[in-house]
Every structure is written in structure tokens, then in C-alpha cells.
Amino acid sequence: MSAPKSGGDPLPHPPKEQLPDISYCITSPPPWPEAVLLGFQHYLVMLGTTVLIPSALVPQMGGRNEEKAKLIQTILFVAGLNTLLQTVFGTRLPAVIGASYTFVPVTISIMLSGRFNDVADPVERFKRIIRATQGALIVASTLQIILGFSGLWRNVVRFLSPLSAAPLVGLVGYGLYELGFPGVAKCIEIGLPGLIILILISQYMPHVIKGGKHVFARFAVIFSVAIVWLYAFFLTLGGAYNGVGTDTQRSCRTDRAGLISAAPWIRVPWPFQWGAPLFDAGEAFAMMMASFVALVESTGAFIAVSRYASATMPPPSVISRGVGWQGVAILISGLFGTGIGSSVSVENAGLLALTKIGSRRVVQISAGFMIFFSILGKFGAVFASIPSPIIAALYCLFFAYVGAGGLSLLQFCNLNSFRTLFILGFSIFLGLSIPQYFNEHTAIKGYGPVHTGARWFNDMVNVPFSSKAFVGGCVAYLLDTTLHKKDGSIRKDRGKHWWDRFWTFKNDPRTEEFYALPFNLNKYFPSV
């Protein structure tokens, strides 16, 4: 198409199946020194969730700093294993597989169940609760393993279009807004400078100092965390938080001596380290529903990762394969006793966008750091002592990038269609509104809107409707596949024709380049 004449109508930006301006795509690794630093950066980012979840749950379970340190080490170790499995045998996307907030409500429900009230020793109570979550996770893992490896989830993904994927991927990022600025505000004198410095280094400095363009853009996390961590250290050293409330000290202080002293120098986590798993049918069903919610959210996260890795849309068979290996990740989490299930790390997906480096090798190196620092507990505990508002400042940028990745899929859709506008607007609105009702009800009354005598049934209903990505994605998927589907023009409005070539593995040569299994395994496990 020729360029418009001067004064003519401007041309729209052409849709791009692969995101341009990515420095290193999924198959092109950066030089080793740079790759190692980038891998360490991914490790720093995933530490946030790894530390925050045990820090919130372990004291309520009855555990001490020793148990908290061991649980953090276990989650780190398992995350490293699962990330390697996903990048080598799963989708092969540069996706970090870490602890997921989706499983937290079910873990809390297990913790509050009356069957542990008779345990007097707090540490023994902690171990019993962990063993109960182990049993639930082991059973729940079968859902994703069966749906993924049998190809059943592939049949669901085939009906996905850019229109229905946009709310799903968008809410995977934007739906985590509660972990962003509210976390920054827990210690505003640390969190807000962290956010401002991160934006200055990553967005403005590359344009001001041309020679260091790539350095500032790619290593903004390391620079900003180091600067603000040092600033927080001097505030702590100067006595700024002496005499303040416990919550403020926990959020602001850098001298978490309890965690560092409690961590062993060298410790290798092992399966069933807390004891034999405890199985309960109700808890297993509740955890299975959380697993299904994580499956839907991870499908959106895989699409976001593929976008920022400058890869094409993953074929349904590849996403299904990744879901199967994510089921294996939940199984490993259950065997090792992490107390929480696994899914795709949304914050690390956002880091791909910030650095413009979607290399698979970088994420595999980060998995090596996870395993290394999980074994050397003291060193890992030092990095785990980074104040949470600094991590929340990173989340503000990373979750925004993932949400924007979802909105970018709308370039394939007809935004002048009222059908498109209805599905897009209605699904995003309900994706925010319904979980808001469920979460508000839980915060005010202490239990969800569905409150029967069966705790497991309550969790099976309350957990999915508390997930913004799950609600918004399901509403968009349902409307998009049922509303005037037989109309021929609707297919183009949905953007389906842009993804047709990626719906089977052999249709596009780029698919095999990005997603083929290593060691010629496609010969024995062919994708369709």
C-alpha cells in the first residue's frame, strides 16, 4: 500500500503478529555476561511473591522464623525446577513458574478448618497444615495434568480469539492492582521513591544518555532496587523507625535479622520434608477449583509472555502442553510441601516488556539462581529481606505492561463494531465488578457470599468469582463464541482470521522455530 499524499487521510498502524523492537527474541540469547545479569534480575523480581506469601501465612499457621525460612527456600527450589521444566518441555516460552496468589484462599481455608484446633504445639500445627495442603495440591494437580496432556484444553483454546483474549490477558495484569500502589503506600517514603526512580531509569534515562541506552533500559530493576534499598538501609540505621508500629517496621526496616539468622547455611529441600501428606476430599475439590482458576489465568499469561518474547501466538496444542507441565509443577509443589500452588509469574512477564528481552536462555539462567540461592539459605535470605514496598513499586510497572499486552491484541479486532465494544466493555466491567463484590463481602463479614456448612463448597464458588482474570476471561469467551457467531463478517471483527495460521503446528514455519521440543522429541510427542 502506497503512502498517503500530503493532506490525505492518515493510515492506521498495521497489526503486528510479532511485537517489534525486541532486542533478543525467544530464540536469540544475549551474550553470556549480560544474560547472567538479566537472569539475576528475573530472580530478584520473583522473590517478591516468594517471600510475601510465606510471610503472611506461616505466622498464622504457628510457624516460627525457622519454618518461614525453610518454606521460602522450598518455594524457591521448586520454582527453579518448574521454570526449567516449562522452558524446556512445556510451552518453551520464557515464563517463570512461581508461587500463585490464586491458591492462598484455599490454603487459608485449610488452616482455619477445625481439625487442627486440638494440636497444642504451634510448630506441629504448622506441619499438619502444610501436610494437609500437600495432599490437596497432589490431588488438584491431576486436573491440569489431564486437561493439558490429553489435549482437552487444546480444544478450549481453539475457540479463543483476539477479542476474547484481550480481557483475559488484560485482567491478568490489571487485576493485580491491589498488589501495586497499596503495597507502595505501606511505607510511602520508600515505595514512592522506588517507583519514581524505576520510571526515571527505565523510561527517561535511555533518551537522556544515549550511550547507556541499553544499560538503563535492561538493568533498571537492579539499579533502582540497589539505590532504594541503600536509602532504606540508612533510614533504618538512623533510627527513623524506632518506636513506630509493628506493621510499619515490618514494611520499612531492612534489618530482618530474624529471617537471616533462622535460615540455614546449606539446605537442600526434599519431598515430604514435613511428613506424609494428609488427604481430605473436600479440601482436594476446593484446591482443584483453585487449580482450574490458575489454569485460565496462566493461559492469559502465556499469551502475554509470547507477545513480549516477540514470538507468534502459541498454537492450542502448545498451550495445552504447557498446562500439562504446569500440572506437574503443582504436583511437585505438593510433593515438596510449599503450602501453595504454582502458576505463571505475571511480574516476570512484565519484566520481559521492560527489558525488551524475551530470551528463553535468560529465564533458564534465572531458574539456576533460584535453585542456587534456595540451597545457600543465608545468601537467599539477604535478598529476601528487601522491603516489600520496593517490590510493590516494581509491580506497578510490570502488571501495567502485562495488562497493556492484553489491550494490544485489540489491534486485530474491529473496534468500530458494536458487538466488539459490547463484549470488550461488558467482560472487563464484570471482571472488575463481580470480584469486587466477593472480596468486599469477605473483608467485611469474614466469609464469602456463598456461606454454607460445607467449607469446601464455599471455596469452590468463592475462589473463582474472586479472580478478575477468570471472571472477565470467561465472560468474554462465552459471549464471543455464542453471540452471532454464524455471521461471516463477525469472524473478521473478532480478529480470528489473524490467528488461523497458528491454530495448527505445521501451518507457519515460525511455530516450529519457537515451540518445537528439544532433542527431536517432537518426533515422539508430535504437536497438532
Curated annotation (Swiss-Prot):
Membrane-protein topology: Multi-pass membrane protein
UniProt region (Disordered), positions on chain: 1-20
Top-level taxon of the source organism: Eukaryota
Pfam families per record: Xan_ur_permease
GO molecular function terms listed in the Swiss-Prot or TrEMBL record: transmembrane transporter activity
Key words, A-Z: Membrane, Transmembrane, Transmembrane helix, Transport
Tissue: Weakly expressed in the vasculature of developing leaves.
Transmembrane region(s): 35-55, 71-91, 93-113, 133-153, 159-179, 181-201, 219-239, 285-305, 367-387, 390-410, 418-438, 460-479
UniProt xrefs under InterPro entries: NCS2 (IPR006043)
Subcellular locations according to the entry: Membrane
GO (cellular component) term, any one: membrane
Record-stated family: Belongs to the nucleobase:cation symporter-2 (NCS2) (TC 2.A.40) family.
NCBIfam families documented for this protein: NCS2_1
Listed PANTHER family: XANTHINE-URACIL / VITAMIN C PERMEASE FAMILY MEMBER
Name by which UniProt lists this protein: Nucleobase-ascorbate transporter 5
Source organism (scientific name): Arabidopsis thaliana
Encoding gene per record: NAT5
